[in-house]
């Protein structure tokens, strides 16, 4: 991996800078390096468990034109459980992700306090799901969505005005003319990080081709493509070389778009003058509340979550 030294410190060391917080849950660095006993840890070794690639810092989105929505008040995860937004809230129907959106909301609203928000106990899962099921019965949640495309359709159809929303949906909604924004929660973002692994059975030319593929992901071009839907890549400067100055300024540097910008398909999605919520990459990466994590009690969580969405 000749470009390993260019991979962002966010994944190689755990934070983007000395003043940044690592966040609760399984920060990628904690399971990145393979040790001599085959365990995974943050201690650097010559072996990695995966090649860190695409990542982002998620929050919730809102339609600025929806009745009763005030952008000035959308600064806390607590808004997802705000009685004033009764019947307008959507949550992603993926327990390993949606649980963090609602846990951050419950804690920010002062309704619950968790020992470790990245790894809830059975009792904490029960208490949180009981609260959510009650809110659902009262009509607080308007819907639960399964895919980014479905979320886009639901917000376009005015099924919800506030809720879980990912960057591809934000880009697609902006392309449709919806005045949607992602919140910048004071509590921090829910972060996630993808990566690529190799099968231990690869040999010869197959293994060489697999390494060529991994290195291609670090070449910069793939990162430029995913940047146009709001995602970040672990080799920041490589990506910069494949974006126009205007694209780099908007997607990574946090500046206002100096011209209309395309999505990955080439269709205009970002209009001139727009500013990305949360600002620059380094600012967003410094404000992580929790990482997407498969909790110790994941199986129990899935069963309880099913009661919520059924």
Feature locations, PLM:
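Mature extracytoplasmic/periplasmic domains
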Residues: 198-276
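Non-transmembrane alpha-helical segments in soluble domains
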Residues: 78-81, 103, 129-133, 152, ...
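Sec/Tat-exported extracytoplasmic proteins
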Residues: 64, 84, 93, 106-110, ...
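Conserved C-terminal helix/tail region of periplasmic/extracytoplasmic solute-binding proteins
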Residues: 265-310
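A bilobed periplasmic-binding-protein/Venus flytrap-type ligand-binding module shared by bacterial periplasmic
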Residues: 59-67, 105, 193-206, 225-226
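Extracytoplasmic/periplasmic substrate-binding proteins
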Residues: 140-203, 247
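Extracytoplasmic ligand-binding site segments that recognize negatively charged/polar headgroups
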Residues: 2-152
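Loop/turn elements at helix/coil->beta-strand transitions in domains of secreted/extracellular proteins
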Residues: 28-30, 85-88, 137-140, 157-161, ...
């Amino acid at each position: 991996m000749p470009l390993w030294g260019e991979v962002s410190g966010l994944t190689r060391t755990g934070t983007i800078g000395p003043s940044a917080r690592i966040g609760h849950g399984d920060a990628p660095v904690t399971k990145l390096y393979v040790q001599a006993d085959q365990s995974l840890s943050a201690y650097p070794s010559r072996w990695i468990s995966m090649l860190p690639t695409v990542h982002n810092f998620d929050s919730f989105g809102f339609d600025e034109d929806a009745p009763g929505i005030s952008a000035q008040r959308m600064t806390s995860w607590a808004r997802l459980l705000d009685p004033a937004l009764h019947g307008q809230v959507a949550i992603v129907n993926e327990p390993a992700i949606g649980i963090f959106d609602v846990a951050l909301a419950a804690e920010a609203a002062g309704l619950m306090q968790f020992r470790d928000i990245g790894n809830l106990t059975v009792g904490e899962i029960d208490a949180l799901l009981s609260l959510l099921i009650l809110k659902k019965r009262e009509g607080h949640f308007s819907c639960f969505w399964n895919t980014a495309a479905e979320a886009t359709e639901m917000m376009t159809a005015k099924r919800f005005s506030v809720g879980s929303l990912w960057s591809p949906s934000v880009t697609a909604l902006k392309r449709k003319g919806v005045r949607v924004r992602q919140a910048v929660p004071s509590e921090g973002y829910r972060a996630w990080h993808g990566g690529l692994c190799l099968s231990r059975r690869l040999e010869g030319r197959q293994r060489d081709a697999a390494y060529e593929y991994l290195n291609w992901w670090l070449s910069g071009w793939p990162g430029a493509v995913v940047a146009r839907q709001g995602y970040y890549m672990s080799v920041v400067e490589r990506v910069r070389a494949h974006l126009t100055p205007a694209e780099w300024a908007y997607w990574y540097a946090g500046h206002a778009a100096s011209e209309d910008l395309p999505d990955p398909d080439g269709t205009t999605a970002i209009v001139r003058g727009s500013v990305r919520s949360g600002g620059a990459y380094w600012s967003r990466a410094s404000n992580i509340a929790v990482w997407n994590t498969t909790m110790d009690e994941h199986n129990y969580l899935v069963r309880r979550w099913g009661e919520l969405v059924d």
